Amino acid sequence: GRIFNGSGKPIDNGPPILPEAYLDISGSSINPSERTYPEEMIQTGISTIDVMNSIARGQKIPFFSAAGLPHNEIAAQICRQAGLVKRLEKAGDLLEDGEEDNFAIVFAAMGVNMETAQFFKRDFEENGSMERVTLFLNLANDPTIERIITPRIALTTAEYLAYECGKHVLVILTDMSSYADALREVSAAREEVPGRRGYPGYMYTDLATIYERAGRIEGRKGSITQIPILTMPNDDITHPTPDLTGYITEGQIYIDRQLHNRQIYPPINVLPSLSRLMKSAIGEGMTRRDHADVSNQLYANYAIGKDVQAMKAVVGEEALSSEDLLYLEFLDKFERKFVTQGAYDTRNIFQSLDLAWTLLRIFPRELLHRIPAKTLDQYYSRDAAN
């Protein structure tokens, strides 16, 4: 519940910090054989992420955004809503984890302007999420060199909370593009040989030293899940920062300008988004048996709907078949009801799955090819929807 500057000094007028331990901010190297595979889900309360790009505890998954898109609002919303999904043995179903004290958030902002810093501080304090958030703020007018140590201080804090205190920690780093620019600036000052677009040749290695500090360790209860946010200059996904980040991390969540221009919030485009570890975070015992099938069917139908929409622009609506019109109806409702979500509208994973079934019922059973008959029998009829 404290606020620090980019060097780790408190700036919230609170009492001085009494250190329990002094740790190297570069992190101690972890024996690869001691790492365990990320499992179980961190619930963000946002349908497009929870249902279609589920985040496992211990995963690293970046948000690819761009200037003028609401990535800060989405980050603040995740901080407000994020939590664990826990099994309730008695009912045989899952519920949101009641043990909130077992979940913590470390938020590091690098190179942000004063307005953004105030937005995060005010949002966390007003909505009661500050008590589980540790906030590090490196402002745009702070020294460049400080920007390079801010994420490392944040991750050292997260490692202590995860591996010494047994907490499941979500680390949000924004904006990694500012970090990469700081790295380029320092590299140029040291007169090192520049690489692609002036960034240093070791930027891949340097980014890996940050991203690879996510994960779980055998014999320790806690986990570190990372969500780095980066703004792509000129919406260019081939820019070195998003390009190298994509190689290191386990998927990406793509914030789309076209959806944003159509007033859809959060403007998450599910088609280029991907969570590589989703399969180990969902399913019976972790979320719900139908989760993977529903996600596959939503992806398939949304992709077909996009194709039909493009075809309609060429041949006109009169030339479309009745089946095509169903896909168009699904496309419209999917974006208006499933993707669109209020900034303070939290949906748990079961509400999101039920909403997905409501949309899939637009189609007759025969068109739902990705869902096994057994699952359809249980969930397709309206009465079966719990």
Swiss-Prot record:
SUPFAM superfamilies: P-loop containing nucleoside triphosphate hydrolases. The keyword Lipid metabolism does not apply. Keywords: Hydrogen ion transport, Ion transport, Transport. Pfam families: ATP-synt_ab (PF00006), ATP-synt_VA_C (PF22919). It comes from the Eukaryota. One of its GO terms (cellular component) is proton-transporting V-type ATPase, V1 domain. One of its GO terms (biological process) is vacuolar acidification. GO terms for molecular function: ATP binding; proton-transporting ATPase activity, rotational mechanism. Belongs to the ATPase alpha/beta chains family. Non-catalytic subunit of the peripheral V1 complex of vacuolar ATPase. V-ATPase is responsible for acidifying a variety of intracellular compartments in eukaryotic cells. PANTHER family: V-TYPE PROTON ATPASE SUBUNIT B, V-TYPE PROTON ATPASE SUBUNIT B1-RELATED. V-ATPase is a heteromultimeric enzyme composed of a peripheral catalytic V1 complex (main components: subunits A, B, C, D, E, and F) attached to an integral membrane V0 proton pore complex (main component: the proteolipid protein). This is V-type proton ATPase subunit B 2. It comes from Gossypium hirsutum.
